[in-house]
Curated annotation (Swiss-Prot):
Organism in which the protein naturally occurs: Pongo abelii
Keywords: Acetylation, Nucleus, Transcription, Transcription regulation
Main location: nucleus
Modified residues (N-acetylmethionine): 1
Lineage: superkingdom: Eukaryota
Protein name: Transcription initiation factor TFIID subunit 11
Ranges annotated as biased composition (Basic and acidic residues): 1-14, 46-74
């Protein structure tokens, strides 16, 4: 009797549950994804090709951008800047050509030296003033310490100066009809002649008096 008096809703609920249970094993709406093999290799190859294509496009774009920037920079240069750039390039080429000419002239000159002249030239090239002595001399005169570049420059200038004095002394010795080695009188006469030519500055300061 109790079963007969159950509400229709209770019956319907039981019926719905049994229907769901029966439909679950063979649900036609459910998709069986496990049974379909995934094409992962094909997708990976496609992704790699796409990435390579994008990278190539980016590289070509960067190159074109750089070329455009260079063209814009060259177009933005004023005529004066362009002329300065051309002048600098021409000066550099001219200097290189002059250096090559000087080297060639020096080679021709050395090849024409006699044995005595060649020995003197080699001795002159190898000779050098001691930098420590030059540095002490400069510091004693100026009263301040100097850099190594100043010492090197003064050492080179001193070498050139001594070479000019010796050359003039050799000319004096030849004009006097005497033979080397050089003597103090030849050196004194050479210094006197160089001073008279204005090639050696006067070490004694003379006060100029206006009348």
């Amino acid at each position: 009797m109790d079963d007969a008096h159950k509400s229709p809703s209770d019956k319907g609920g039981e019926t719905g549950e049994s229907d769901e249970t029966a439909a679950a094993p063979g649900d036609p709406g459910a998709t069986d994804t496990d049974g379909i093999p995934e094409d992962t290799d094909g997708d990976a190859d496609a992704d790699l090709k796409e990435a390579a294509a994008e990278e190539g496009e980016l590289k070509s774009q960067d190159i074109s951008d750089l070329t455009t920037v260079e063209r814009e920079d060259s177009s933005l240069l004023t005529p004066a800047a362009k002329k300065l750039k051309i002048d600098t390039k021409e000066k550099k080429e001219k200097k290189q050509k002059v250096d090559e000419d000087e080297i060639q002239k020096m080679q021709i000159l050395v090849s024409s030296f006699s044995e005595e002249q060649l020995n003197r030239y080699e001795m002159y090239r190898r000779s050098a003033f001691p930098k420590a002595a030059i540095k002490r001399l400069i510091q004693s005169i100026t009263g301040t310490s100097v850099s190594q570049n100043v010492v090197i420059a003064m050492s080179g200038i001193s070498k050139v100066f001594v070479g000019e004095v010796v050359e003039e002394a050799l000319d004096v010795c030849e004009k006097w009809g005497e033979m080397p080695p050089l003597q103090p009188k030849h050196m004194r006469e050479a210094v006197r002649r160089l001073k008279s030519k204005g090639q050696i500055p006067n070490s004694k300061h003379k006060k100029i008096i206006f009348f």
